[in-house]
Amino acid sequence: WEQYYRRRNHLARNHAPLEAKRFAGMAGEMAAVLWCGLVLLLGFGIPSAWLLWAAWRYVGDTDWAAFAHMGFYTLRLALTVAAIGTALAFVLQAWQRATARGKGLIRLAGLGYGVSGTVLAIGVLMITTAFDHKINAISKALGFGMVGLIWSGTIAALVYAFLCRFAAVSLWAVESGFAHIPPSLDQSAFLLGCSEKQTAWRLWLPLLRNSLVTAALLLFLESMKELSAAMLLRPFNVQTLSTYIYEYISAERFEMAALPALLMVVLGLPLVALLLKTMED
């Protein structure tokens, strides 16, 4: 039966090749513009207009001190994850390039992208909590007393979870950049007396500039909008943009979520434009 249906539904045998439909004349061009504009209007224009209206109407009810702290915390978290994740991706891919080893380790590091944020956050919470308990037990045994939650109660747990969650994004971006560097350049550098570290610093790093920028931008965007891991691992009395929006949406106070949603859009759109420009280059 499988072979029968496969033969029956084979596109190459039963259907003509797909051809792009071309619009002729001014009417066709206007139809294409209107159709694309309608998609943009429904998907971005109308929602953005409503967010602007709601943010303007309820701007007087905003706690600006808490809002600024939340925005700064989200920005610091995303920048930290982007910097550390991009650096680790470059180090791992450079090590794999120089030694032809570690391919399995890189694939293992990228498995977190296929795990949901909630499941990953629970695993990270178990690890960080056990680490904190062990540190407190050792400190108490040495007579220094309890040191508190130095791992699970800080931004470090979020950074760790986000790096595990989005490592694949940066690894793939850097790996794609390395694929465009011919091995003959590496051999030339080695013949000229450059060590592996010098080759990585003086050859690979400049050539991978666009790939590293792409990896950093992707990590920043993913970290800024991640919700489930942030809900479980954020320190007490600390909000990110995504958790702040979620709490107001859950309470059906949609207007109060408009301003942080706009801030997320304002932060994300220029980065997306820069990302597209970098990928084109």
Set out the residue ranges of the language-model regions.
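Cytoplasmic-entry segments and transmembrane alpha-helices of multi-pass inner-membrane transporters
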Residues: 28-35, 92-128, 186
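Membrane-interfacial helix termini and adjacent extracytoplasmic/periplasmic loops
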Residues: 14-22, 64-65, 100-105, 121-163, ...
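Membrane-cytosol interface at the C-terminal ends of specific transmembrane alpha-helices
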Residues: 151-190, 216
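C-terminal transmembrane helix and the adjacent membrane-cytosol boundary/short C-terminal tail
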Residues: 1-23, 92-101, 175-186, 190, ...
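Periplasmic/extracellular loop-to-transmembrane helix junction in inner-membrane transport proteins
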Residues: 19-30, 49-83, 98-101, 145-150, ...
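Interhelical loop and adjacent transmembrane-helix boundary motif
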Residues: 1, 23-29, 51-65, 224, ...
